[in-house]
């Protein structure tokens, strides 16, 4: 049996327990959450946490990296996931872009944790170019990119290559979710987190 040194034990993050409560419309999931909060060690974040099931979330990422792999698809899925995480991370106000403010709600650098998670999944980053990257750029930018190509200057951008196994994806995703919530759990002194509409 291996025994970890005391300093190693204190630095490791304890795995949390999760309870996912789902409903449809106003079917009462919040009442269920309020009831579960009454138990010792249970807590819930404010609002829904839908990173697993929303478009560009974890389910789409797994589908593209593990179940339906394609050379370009996996790069686009990672980009979409990181852009989605920007929305989840940033604050929102009346005159700003939409955001969910999870960096503040969870007491974590949401984007840093998301980038570290992706770093664990990818095999390499390389310079590449695909027309798919130009699908959503403005016409003027597309024009300049075409001109750049005409004069022999490439439009290569960093691209991701990731093909994790199902077990590796599951392990890293579990660690990622735990890293997102561990600061909040420590702050609130809870060991079981209730998530609304998570799956």
Give each language-model segment a name.
Residues 171-199:
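Conserved helicase/translocase P-loop NTPase motor core
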């Amino acid at each position: 049996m291996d025994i970890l040194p005391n300093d190693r034990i204190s630095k490791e993050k304890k795995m949390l327990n999760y309870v996912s409560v789902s409903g449809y419309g106003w079917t009462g999931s919040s009442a269920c959450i309020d009831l579960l909060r009454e138990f010792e060690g249970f807590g819930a974040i404010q609002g829904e946490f839908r990173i697993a099931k929303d478009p560009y979330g974890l389910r789409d990422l797994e589908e593209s990296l593990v179940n339906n792999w394609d050379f370009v698809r996996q790069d686009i899925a990672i980009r979409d996931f990181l852009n989605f995480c920007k929305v989840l991370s940033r604050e929102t106000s009346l005159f700003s872009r939409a955001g969910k403010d999870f960096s503040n709600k969870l007491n974590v650098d949401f984007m840093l944790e998301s980038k570290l998670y992706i770093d664990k999944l990818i095999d390499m980053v390389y310079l590449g170019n695909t027309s798919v990257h130009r699908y959503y750029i403005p016409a003027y930018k597309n024009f300049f990119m075409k001109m750049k190509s005409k004069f022999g200057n490439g439009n290569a951008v960093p691209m991701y290559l990731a093909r994790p196994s199902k077990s590796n994806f599951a392990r890293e995703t579990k660690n990622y979710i735990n890293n997102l919530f561990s600061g909040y759990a420590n702050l609130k002194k809870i060991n079981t987190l209730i998530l609304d509409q998570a799956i």
